[in-house]
Amino acid sequence: FLRLYWIPIICLGLLACNRDQDASLEPTTEIIKLNPDTMHDHRILEQNALRNAYFGDLHVHSNNSLDAYSLAGVRASTDDAYRFARGEAIDHPFGYKIRLKGEALDFYAVSDHAEFFGVVKSLADPAGPLRDHPLAALIQSPDKADNRKGFVALESELTRGEPIDPPLGSEAVLRSAWQENINIANKNYEPGKFTTFIAYEYSSHPQNANLHRVVLFPGDDGPLRPFGSQDSLNPEDLWDWLDALRSDGLDSIAIPHNSNWSQGLMFQRVTMDGGPVTPAYAKQRLRNEPIVEITQIKGTSETHPLLSPEDEWSDFELWFKNRGKVDEEGRRIRDEDGNVVEFDGATTGAYARDALLAGMELEEAVGTNMYQFGFIGSTDGHNAASPFEEDEYFGKLGTNDGSPELRGSVPTDEKLPSIFSDTLDWSASGLAGVWAEQNTRESIFQALKRKEIFATSGPRIRVRFFGGYDYPDDLDRAPDSIEKAYAKGVPMGGELLAEGNRVPHFFLSASRDPSGGFLQRAQIVKGWINEGKSHEQIFDVACSDNLVP
């Protein structure tokens, strides 16, 4: 099953906070520069001007992440994660081996949480600099309950949006772990064969609203340390920091994810403090966040039945927190008017398709569209691995869902942990697809920025979409169809400008995963604004099984 969303327009955002704090703990825009002799040379690599499809995962956690180490028992490292992506077997926290069933991935980013980056691993080290901290005993304990207490104590520090006091907020520990992360990413980068990205996750969750972003850097260099929620809970401050790095020569993108649990805050029609969106604000957001992760283990963030009632697949892999309340027999609870009683979070501002329309509405008001973004999928796997293969699913969070019993796949008499209600509903998903000239950091990063990208829930389906005014009727049958599509139009992610009353033509190409099932249909979801109100309509453009679009 494949669907495409065509909205020909643009938009974006800004803000900041001042804090009186120790200068050593302030966010820094200093950049770590590599020795030029160790940098990668791509001049000898072949390029395909018509671009190749590459698949990867830009959202993976290793033992540097607070929750992976203390809550899930994950000991697999950043280096192990890259080994997994290349097709090697690594250890699951439950002791068995995990590896990809299908082909190796083309690109990968280990994006550990900025908050307490490497700190828990240091607490667990009997010879480490934090070995005498009171929480070290909880983290080092063989009792999982103690580990969880340590996790809860650390996580509680992150809701304040304030610098963490030493020694837990040790800049030395953070910078050392971050520098190691950069070194390992660069060591595993093999231009033309396997691309790694320096990355981390900004993990702001004010009042339990998910405002997380993966931050991705394009080259061999990275900042001195990552900017996290301990620096600010406000993502607008993150954009300011990224802009400052950009002015010093270090580009980046931030990728929002799990907007489905943002309580409607991810894609608001106002600023974070409730102010009006201005053109400058909109441009800043678009500059820093040109793409969005719309599918992963914790469900889809594409759309919701309440937002797309005419879409029969709008409930695809919804997280249970977004599906609506159910009774003891699993039936949706409805109010006296017959409406589904929703959980918090299933709201306007929480889904990407709704945001595309909101951006068009904002453009009419302020002249700029801050939600003209592209889509990717990734996993958010916390085992230093990517569980996107449905028939080889090994869970997301180590010892919390690493067995069939813990995922509810087989019956058990054992008492299940409180997180069990979450693990029941997690999905094997997803992947990022890009169209790029070559498998290098530069080429893939540019594909991400121009949004010639797509999301899948795991299968390696190859999707292309073009728009233009001069496409011949037989373009789909032409042997040089892709070349003509580029020459006479614009690819997915681009802008097709209106030309009077001329009617555009669209060219869609999709091919199945060679190891997966056949495609059932291709759809285009059209969104538009009429008299200040947004609308969407779904079109079947190609069907199998003798169905007629």
Language-model-derived ranges and their functions:
Residues 221, 231-233:
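Conserved, charged catalytic cores of large soluble enzymes
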Residues 14-16:
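C-terminal motif of bacterial Sec signal peptides marking the signal peptidase cleavage site
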Residues 221-226, 294:
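Active-site gating/metal-coordination segments in enzymes
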Residues 18-78, 82-85, 89-141, 167-170, ...:
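C-terminal functional module detector
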